């Protein structure tokens, strides 16, 4: 079975690589040191510091594994390869819900770079799926768990 690929910009991949380096060179050694200190407290069966450190170690190792997979199977997307006004990973899109006045701006990213609070939506999200491949002036229907709504694409530009 073919491994899943993770479409992303080169910048997103570089960010993941830095995050992985931080986990391996800083967080992992810190956790190992905390485990060592907690072990020195004696009886491990009632040692909450040891349990907490082991839990954190499992979390950090899970993050490392996840990042390594995303980096290994990264598919670098070149937003210059699509039309200038076409929605793709690496593009900034301004949309407006039909019948509303407010405009919304999103940056389309691969799933590894999604950050809703920063306005970065994944190409796999309902918004991303509805917008990918559309062009300035097109309308799109965004399907959500609570219903659907139509938006007009006002502007598409390369993300700075």
UniProtKB/Swiss-Prot annotation:
* Classification via PROSITE patterns: GREAB_1, GREAB_2
Q: What does this protein do?
A: Necessary for efficient RNA polymerase transcription elongation past template-encoded arresting sites. The arresting sites in DNA have the property of trapping a certain fraction of elongating RNA polymerases that pass through, resulting in locked ternary complexes. Cleavage of the nascent transcript by cleavage factors such as GreA or GreB allows the resumption of elongation from the new 3'terminus. GreA releases sequences of 2 to 3 nucleotides.
Name of the protein described by the UniProt record: Transcription elongation factor GreA
Q: Which family does it belong to?
A: Belongs to the GreA/GreB family.
Supply one GO molecular-function term. DNA binding
Q: Which PANTHER family match?
A: TRANSCRIPTION ELONGATION FACTOR GREA
* Keywords of this entry: Coiled coil, DNA-binding, Transcription, Transcription regulation
Entry's transmembrane regions: none
What InterPro entries has UniProt attached to this entry?
A: GreA/GreB_C_sf, TF_GreA/GreB_CS, Tscrpt_elong_fac_GreA, Tscrpt_elong_fac_GreA/B, Tscrpt_elong_fac_GreA/B_C, Tscrpt_elong_fac_GreA/B_fam, Tscrpt_elong_fac_GreA/B_N, Tscrpt_elong_fac_GreA/B_N_sf
Q: Which GO terms describe its biological process?
A: DNA-templated transcription elongation; regulation of DNA-templated transcription elongation
In which domain of life is the source organism classified?
A: Bacteria
Q: Which residues form a coiled coil?
A: 1-72
